[in-house]
From Swiss-Prot:
Few gyrases are as efficient as E.coli at forming negative supercoils. Not all organisms have 2 type II topoisomerases; in organisms with a single type II topoisomerase this enzyme also has to decatenate newly replicated chromosomes. Its main location: cytoplasm. It is found in: Cytoplasm. Belongs to the type II topoisomerase GyrB family. The keyword Isomerase applies. GO terms for cellular component: cytoplasm. The keyword Metal-binding does not apply. CDD domains: TopoII_Trans_DNA_gyrase. Transmembrane segments: none annotated. Heterotetramer, composed of two GyrA and two GyrB chains. In the heterotetramer, GyrA contains the active site tyrosine that forms a transient covalent intermediate with DNA, while GyrB binds cofactors and catalyzes ATP hydrolysis. It comes from Acinetobacter haemolyticus. This is DNA gyrase subunit B.
Amino acid sequence: DNSYKVSGGLHGVGVSVVNALSSKLQLTIHRAGQEHQQEYHHGDPQYPLRVIGETDRTGTIVRFWPSAETFSQTIFNVDILARRLRELSFLNAGVRIVLRDERVNLENVYDYEGGLSEFVRYINEGKTHLNEIFHFTTDADNGISVEVALQWNDSYQENVRCFTNNIPQKDGGTHLAGFRAALTRGLNSYMENENLLKKEKVVVSGDDAREGLTAIISVKVPDPKFSSQTKEKLVSSEVKPAVEQAMNKEFSAYLLENPQAAKSIAGKIIDAARARDAARKAREMTRRKSALDIAGLPGKLADCQEKDPALSELYLVEGDSAGGSAKQGRNRKMQAILPLKGKILNVERARFDKMISSQEVGTLITALGCGIGREEYNPDKLRYHKII
């Protein structure tokens, strides 16, 4: 009962390594009414632990000076420290952390009573949110504590951060797997019960459900197992069912108790599914009709003989009759002609799937050769460096 319930690893290793790599390390311990102190130089104790006074405080102060013999640079980056300390304050609601940079007389205080809710709010600052922040904490029977906070916004990126015993896992792990499984199941169940999938004629995926999602997953595990010493991925098998069970229960209740938020979230997911399907069709179209294979294009394009994009020109003309005149008057060596119908579509205001279903827009995309969508678009493949 006198030891920590959870920790990131072997507690003594961290301070031992810091001690060995420091020209000086000083420990001050306030305990049982006495103040103790010990000092080390390059890892060697200068004197035994000794009592230097009385105190009514409790806690330990560790001061260290990185060794210039070991490190070529011993200057601390305050931005890196600030980011990590702010993160720790979010993860431990009510813990007050003070960062002082005595080089420039700077002091930052991190104290977030809202914990993970404030973490999500901080990340989503400046974005339009679709729902109020959903936040819960629960303790499993096997000693695993699960805390989750999430909110959807109007962006198209997923931003999910995972932590085990306050340590970040950039590669996720079993806690992320449990979270994703429960999230997708809960949303699919809600949309099926509301008959939204049949009504909208879409098939949604887990990626659709997480578009625009900001979430923090924090678990406290008595004996965590990681894939490597850097602890970038959690592999403890017992964590997945603990997170999945807790998330299933809490998130399903949230959707039922907040119908307006659930409707907004479902609407965004359906839009994401449509856009994903449209992007898939666009990729298939551009692959079938390779920009280098003009036979794959509709017969409207009269291409030029020049293959160097820097010397090639593309003229977009309105209608077939104008196209005929342009073809007669062009320089075949460097000028290509593509007739299009007038006012084909205002793509700025059209949804992605409607835009890509336009034959004229599809013809233009294929003729230019750059592809479409975040993954496929490549401006270096533009076939004409002058477009008129």
